[in-house]
Every structure is written in C-alpha cells, then in structure tokens.
C-alpha cells in the first residue's frame, strides 16, 4: 500500500513538472512570435529601390528621318483612300516604295545581324504588297494590299527596328471588307478617319467615316 502511494506521488510530480515545461515552452514560442512579427525591424536593402531601365536613343538622325519620310508617304496613301482617290493612292505608293529603299538598314548591323536580316525581310514584304497595290484597278483590292502593308509595318517592322519616331496609332475597322472582315491602319491622329469605308462608300456613303477604334499606341522614344 505504501509502495503504491509513493509510485502515485512520483507520477504526479513528473506530471506537474511536464506541465510546467510545456507551459514554459509555450511562453517562449509566443514571445518569439511577437518579436518576429511585431518588434523586429524589417530588412531594408542597402542598394535602394530598383530603377527602371533608361531608354537610350539608338538610331542616327538619318535613320529616323528616313523612317519618318516613309511613314509620311504611307499616311498620304491612307488619306487618299479616305477620299476614294485611287490615282493619288497609287502616286503616294510609288513615293512610299522609293522611300522604303532609302531607309539605311545597314545601321542595324551595329546591333546584331539577325536584327538587320529581320528588318530587311520586313521591308521586302512591305514592298511586295505595295507593288501589288500598284497593279490593282479595283479600289477594294488596293485597300486589301494597303491593309497587308500595315500588318507588315506594325508590329513587325516597327518592333524590329525599335521605332523612335513621333507617336502613331494603330486603328481598326471591324467591317473593312464586309461584316466579318476587319482591317487595321496606322494614323498620326487619335481621331478615327476610316480609309476602308471612306467618304464615298457605295453603300454607307460618308456615314461610316469615323467607324473604328484605336487598338494600340505606337510610341517612339
């Protein structure tokens, strides 16, 4: 009987000691958590905030000037289609093709050969579609070639050369060649003036002249 009581007291003492140990452990854990999340100061990088990369001018004035002149001719083609003037559209296209050849792509070789080759391929595709426009007699077919020239210019050519000229806008007509055939064009004005439906459309007349939307902003540096 006495032995049983001693064993029971010993077990109770161990139990109480265990409870004190667990209680102390909990206090330590809670204290650490308070310090970790509420008291300890946050680490601050000595290098400071990360800076955005600075855009540097990469092309010469000659290169950018030639691209600007090329785009001025493109915009003349667009404006001719707004007026339904096929003669002016072809004349402006001839100027546009000549100005394509004046872009000094050799300057791009200072970057990498692949950039030069891609830009050269882009210009060849643009020139082929512009030449096709000259061979057309139907204004609708001419406009289709104009839309292909646009697709080759942006994003293809402009992205390749890292365009640095004045701000332009990529605009879209959802029904350029029918209710479900959209087409894009580039403008130097955010206001939509549609070269595919124009001022003298056989069905809509001038009522759809401002039909369309701005899809993208083409920002130079």
Predicted regions and their residues:
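Intrinsically disordered, low-complexity terminal tails/loops enriched in metal-binding residues
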Residues: 2-221
């Amino acid at each position: 009987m006495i032995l049983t009581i001693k064993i029971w007291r010993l077990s109770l003492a161990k139990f109480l000691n265990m409870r004190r140990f667990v209680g102390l452990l909990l206090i330590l854990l809670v204290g650490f958590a308070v310090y970790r999340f509420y008291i300890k100061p946050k680490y601050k990088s000595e290098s400071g905030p990360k800076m955005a990369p600075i855009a540097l001018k990469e092309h010469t004035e000659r290169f950018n000037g030639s691209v600007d002149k090329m785009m001025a001719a493109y915009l003349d083609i667009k404006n001719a289609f707004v007026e339904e003037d096929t003669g002016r559209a072809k004349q402006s296209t001839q100027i546009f093709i000549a100005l394509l050849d004046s872009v000094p792509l050799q300057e791009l070789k200072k970057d990498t050969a692949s950039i030069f080759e891609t830009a050269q391929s882009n210009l060849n595709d643009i020139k082929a579609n512009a030449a096709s426009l000259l061979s057309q007699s139907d204004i609708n077919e001419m406009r289709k070639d104009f839309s292909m020239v646009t697709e080759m210019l942006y994003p293809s050519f402009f992205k390749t050369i890292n365009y640095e000229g004045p701000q332009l806008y990529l605009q879209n007509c959802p029904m350029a060649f029918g209710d479900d055939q959209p087409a894009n064009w580039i403008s130097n004005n955010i206001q939509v003036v549609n070269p595919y439906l124009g001022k003298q459309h056989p069905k809509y007349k001038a009522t759809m002249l401002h039909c369309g939307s701005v899809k993208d902003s083409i920002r130079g540096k």
